Amino acid sequence: MKKCTILVVASLLLVDSLLPGYGQNKSVQAQRNLNELCYNEENDNKLYHVLNSKNGKIYNRNIVNRLLGDALNGKPEEKKDDPPKDGNKDDLPKEEKKDDLPKEEKKDDPPKDPKKDDPPKEAQNKLNQPVVADENVDQGPGAPQGPGAPQGPGAPQGPGAPQGPGAPQGPGAPQGPGAPQGPGAPQGPGAPQGPGAPQGPGAPQGPGAPQGPGAPQGPGAPQGPGAPQEPPQQPPQQPPQQPPQQPPQQPPQQPPQQPRPQPDGNNNNNNNNGNNNEDSYVPSAEQILEFVKQISSQLTEEWSQCSVTCGSGVRVRKRKNVNKQPENLTLEDIDTEICKMDKCSSIFNIVSNSLGFVILLVLVFFN
């Protein structure tokens, strides 16, 4: 049994080492081949169209050959059919031939006059054609009657209705605000009550209702104590309603709405940038220079091997017209490029093979 196990292990190791297309390596190489091949839809479509065109040409050639073969086979049959036609001509009686040749043919000669009649027919046709063309031409110019329809655009008289917007004469009613002559009593603003009235001008925030600004006339009225009956009706209703409603509504709404969306957007952008930075690999200058020192003897103007056997790394080459020693090279004298080694299966194969050899040696020497 021991010998059998030794032989089996040895055979497996030999197969793995000598035949890389066997076992695990086979699947790995198949994946690599599939990844190396570029299946572009454009190329596939081109190949498909090329094959179809070739098949179409072959099919057309076959059809042509068949038709030619049928034609060649049909010609002798027609020749065979031709002599019976001659026989039919022979079967005709001589009397008929004589009847055909004499007076009838001579009578047919004068019908050359109908040939003369033929050209006039062509002339009639020629005359008819231009007449038809004239009729069509007449019908075409008749179409300009359609442009006569611009009378419809005459309807813009309807826009003449903007005379209705002339109704803004009604807003001319602001002549009532001309009543500020009453506030002309500012002689009394010496009273502190007058400065309180500037709250009323704050009301212009609602210019949508110009009637409101007319209200400041009311506060001016308290200065005219001569008419105490009118002010108590207007000011208590309008001024208390407008100033408390407008100032508290506007300032609290605007400041909280503007600053809040901004930090949110910035946070999202920061998160996205963080994710992108995590995905991308950017080597440092020290790593690049260390790799250059390692490959100083092999560094040329062609790309070097990747600095990593598995994962993402860097490959390097000299720039043209650079004659410095590798020790004195800087990042300005070197072209760098990021390389990725996604397939690390070879490492696992090496490990498995090494373990197999160790097991083989143990079985051979310690048993």
UniProtKB/Swiss-Prot annotation:
Residues 263-277 have a biased composition (Low complexity). The keyword DNA damage does not apply. Residues 139-228 are annotated as: 15 X 6 AA tandem repeats of Q-G-P-G-A-P. It is a lipid-anchor; GPI-anchor. Residues 1-23 form the signal peptide. Disulfide bonds join 306-339, 310-344. During host cell invasion, proteolytically cleaved at the cell membrane in the region I by a papain-like cysteine protease of parasite origin. Cleavage is triggered by the sporozoite contact with highly sulfated heparan sulfate proteoglycans (HSPGs) present on the host hepatocyte cell surface. Cleavage exposes the TSP type-1 (TSR) domain and is required for productive invasion of host hepatocytes but not for adhesion to the host cell membrane. Cleavage is dispensable for sporozoite development in the oocyst, motility and for traversal of host and vector cells. O-glycosylated; maybe by POFUT2. Residues 345-367 form a propeptide. Residues 229-260 are annotated as: 8 X 4 AA approximate tandem repeats of Q-Q-P-P. GO terms for cellular component: cell surface; cytoplasm; plasma membrane; side of membrane. Residues 294-345 form the TSP type-1 domain. Residues 72-281 are annotated as: Disordered. SUPFAM superfamilies: TSP-1 type 1 repeat (SSF82895). Keywords: Cell membrane, Cytoplasm, Disulfide bond, Glycoprotein, GPI-anchor, Lipoprotein, Malaria, Membrane, Repeat, Signal, Sporozoite. Residues 126-130 are annotated as: Region I. Residues 228-262 have a biased composition (Pro residues). Its main location: membrane. Residues 115-121 are annotated as: Required for the binding to heparan sulfate proteoglycans (HSPGs) on the surface of host hepatocytes. It is found in: Cell membrane; Cytoplasm. Residues 143-223 have a biased composition (Gly residues). The N-terminus is involved in the initial binding to heparan sulfate proteoglycans (HSPGs) on the surface of host hepatocytes. The N-terminus masks the TSP type-1 (TSR) domain which maintains the sporozoites in a migratory state, enabling them to complete their journey to the salivary gland in the mosquito vector and then to the host liver. The unmasking of the TSP type-1 (TSR) domain when the sporozoite interacts with the host hepatocyte also protects sporozoites from host antibodies. This is Circumsporozoite protein. The lineage of its organism: Eukaryota, Sar, Alveolata, Apicomplexa, Aconoidasida. The gene is CSP.
